[in-house]
């Protein structure tokens, strides 16, 4: 995947990051990385998170909602599993065999849908209802992924969680049902194991990028704070 999920480094000191980049074969990349992260050198914990949030705000470019449907064919092209250039949809991808269906054309974007495979659309891993579809969150490529429209509708604005007794299961095994993890007992959506790390990193990014706003968002995944961001049960899940 080409997505730059930068917030992996939240668990690292910038010294560690510098060690990672110092062995890069691309000197231009080393130089630009060092410059980009110069303001957070020596920071850790919530101070690092806040500094990264400020840097992300300064450099963020909102490309608009419509552009996502086009860029997905480059950013999310399947080069890891089927290697066929179709969109790599976490809610329909079958990592161990052929996909039940694929999306390989911009014309397959939703519209309406009645079942899986009808069309693809934009899945907000952090539900847009929590921020009332406001920009730039609604258009933010780093948490808005391509997905089957029908499965996206099933996920709705539910939190991610673990499901032992699903009410509904997608063709690739993603599940909808009552959460069986931790104390929260609402309805949740569980993607397949292959992509749980991708989703966790995207949500880590979101919680950092929008630190200045997220305290006012309302959702079961949140704890109402700007620093920790996510509720205790959800942090353990991630």
Task: Give each language-model segment a name.
Residues 13-17:
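Hydrophobic membrane-targeting alpha-helices
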Residues 87, 94-119:
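Short, His- and charge-rich active-site/binding loops that engage polyanionic ligands
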Residues 67-76, 104, 129-133, 186-190:
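Short alpha-helical segments and helix-capping/turn motifs at coil-helix boundaries
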Residues 30, 103-104, 126, 181:
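A generic structural signal for ordered alpha-helices
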Residues 4-12:
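Sec-dependent N-terminal signal peptides
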Residues 109-121, 125-238:
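Domain-level detector of nuclease and nuclease-like folds
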Residues 18-98:
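N-terminal module-boundary/linker segments of secreted carbohydrate-active enzymes
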């Amino acid at each position: 995947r080409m997505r730059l999920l930068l917030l992996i480094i939240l668990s690292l000191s910038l010294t560690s990051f510098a060690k990672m980049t110092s062995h890069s074969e691309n000197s231009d990349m080393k130089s630009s990385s060092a410059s980009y992260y110069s303001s957070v050198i020596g920071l850790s914990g919530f101070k690092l998170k806040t500094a990264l949030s400020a840097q992300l705000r300064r450099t963020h470019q909102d490309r608009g909602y419509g552009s996502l449907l086009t860029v997905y064919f480059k950013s999310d092209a399947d080069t890891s599993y089927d290697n066929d250039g179709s969109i790599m949809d976490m809610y329909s991808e079958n990592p161990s065999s052929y996909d039940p269906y694929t999306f390989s054309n911009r014309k397959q974007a939703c519209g309406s849908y009645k079942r899986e495979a009808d069309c693809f659309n934009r899945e907000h891993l952090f539900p847009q209802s929590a921020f009332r579809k406001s920009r730039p969150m609604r258009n933010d490529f780093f948490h808005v992924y391509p997905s089957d429209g029908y499965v996206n509708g099933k996920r709705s604005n539910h939190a991610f969680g673990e499901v032992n007794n699903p009410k509904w299961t997608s063709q690739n095994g993603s599940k909808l049902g009552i959460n069986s993890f931790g104390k929260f007992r609402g309805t949740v959506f569980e993607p397949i194991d292959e992509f749980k790390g991708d989703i966790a990193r995207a949500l880590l990014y979101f919680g950092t990028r929008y630190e200045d706003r997220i305290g006012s968002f309302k959702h079961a995944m949140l704890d109402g704070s700007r620093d920790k961001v996510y509720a205790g049960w959800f942090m353990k899940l991630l």
